[in-house]
Amino acid sequence: MKLTTVLIVAVLVLAACQFTVTDNSGDDTENPSLRSAGENQNPDSTKTITARATRARTNMRRGLSRPSKGCIGGGDPCEFHRGYTCCSEHCIIWVCA
């Protein structure tokens, strides 16, 4: 029982850390939270992002996805512990922001 509680707390702490990590470069133009609210209200955009992320994930597994800039674009899958591989340096729930 105690082990389960400790594991749950550890997972919650790691998840919270993922959301609190910020880019300290001083350039706020890349920050997705500063975009206008109307930009994300299209219901089709979720399907497009999901399809693109699925396609990119499949290509990454096959070794076909090689970003030209040396970083992963927004909406593409990433590894949360390697957020620096995203162009925005923000990997939220395994997707580059």
From Swiss-Prot:
Residues 23-60 form a propeptide. Expressed by the venom duct. Residues 23-49 are annotated as: Disordered. It is found in: Secreted. This is Conotoxin Cal6.1e. Keywords: Cleavage on pair of basic residues, Disulfide bond, Ion channel impairing toxin, Knottin, Neurotoxin, Secreted, Signal, Toxin. Probable neurotoxin with unknown target. Possibly targets ion channels. One of its GO terms (molecular function) is ion channel inhibitor activity. Its main location: secreted. The keyword Phosphoprotein does not apply. Belongs to the conotoxin O1 superfamily. GO terms for cellular component: extracellular region. It comes from Californiconus californicus. InterPro entries: Conotoxin.
